[in-house]
Amino acid sequence: TTVHRQNRIINNIILETTLDITPKTIVGFENHGGRTYSNYTPLGNVLVGKGNNDTDGVEGVVYKNYIGTYLHGPILPKNPHVADYLILKALQNKYEVESLEKLDDTIEYLAHEKFLKLYNK
């Protein structure tokens, strides 16, 4: 269930994700007026920011092959492990693929780590 509120949630955000990926953190930006309440598995637990609403400490939803989130901006470039997860799941939906060829994500992970260091995480 999502309800609209006049005051927007505008924050940088850091999650500890429920996805089977490494690292376990997802960094991003949230800017939304909606407050979402769900019984589905969350994308992650909020370490910094507000998430789905101002009360339950979670962000996003994971249901089957679907991921919903309020995170936006450069979420995939700052979280290459999330990009790899999405690409792998999409390929596995049609093909017998077990893993992706590793790419050099050094710069992307530096951006991810710099974001975490801003909040001592």
List PLM regions with ranges.
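Short, flexible turn/loop "capping" segments at secondary-structure junctions
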Residues: 60-64
